[in-house]
């Protein structure tokens, strides 16, 4: 690799990754979750460098905001936000999931614009 190729690659990676202290999702987090009807299931995302931003879970089927931070914003009592202080893990727990709960969910970081990590649930 010559110097100009390395320089281009370095510029591209810097632009693609954004600021070195910007929040990002741990790419090793599972994107496909399979659960059983009636058995609790947990959707997970790991966020690095969150700083003062918040994490939310959104159900794509109806663009329903389910959680913000550790607070649950849906009247459906089966959904629960889970997060341990000082942890990088943010989870959405669904008690007694049904087949209709299958589909895409998104863990979002409150950047401008928001960035998301899609998780697909199959019940």
Residue ranges and their predicted role:
Residues 1-24, 48-80, 116:
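N-terminal V-set
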Residues 4-5, 19, 28, 56, ...:
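Generic serine detector
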Residues 13-41:
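N-terminal edge beta-strand
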Residues 24-27, 36-37, 49, 75-76, ...:
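Repeat-scaffold signature, strongest for collagen triple-helical Gly-X-Y repeats
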Residues 31-33, 46, 68-70, 80-83, ...:
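Beta-strand elements of modular eukaryotic interaction domains
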Residues 40-49, 54-62, 93-96, 101-112, ...:
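Structural signature of extracellular immunoglobulin-like
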Residues 82, 86-91:
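Aromatic sugar-binding surface patches on proteins
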């Amino acid at each position: 690799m010559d110097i100009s190729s390395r320089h281009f690659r370095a510029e591209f990676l810097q632009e693609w990754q954004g600021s070195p202290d910007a929040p990002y999702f741990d790419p090793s987090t599972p994107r496909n979750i399979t659960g059983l009807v009636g058995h609790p299931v947990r959707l997970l995302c790991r966020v690095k460098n969150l700083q003062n931003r918040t994490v939310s879970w959104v159900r794509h089927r109806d663009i329903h905001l389910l959680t913000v931070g550790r607070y649950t914003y849906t009247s459906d009592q089966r959904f629960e936000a889970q997060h341990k202080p000082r942890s990088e893990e943010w989870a959405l727990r669904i008690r007694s999931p049904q087949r209709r709960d299958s589909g895409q969910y998104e863990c979002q970081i409150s950047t401008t614009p928001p960035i998301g990590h899609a998780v697909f649930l199959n019940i």
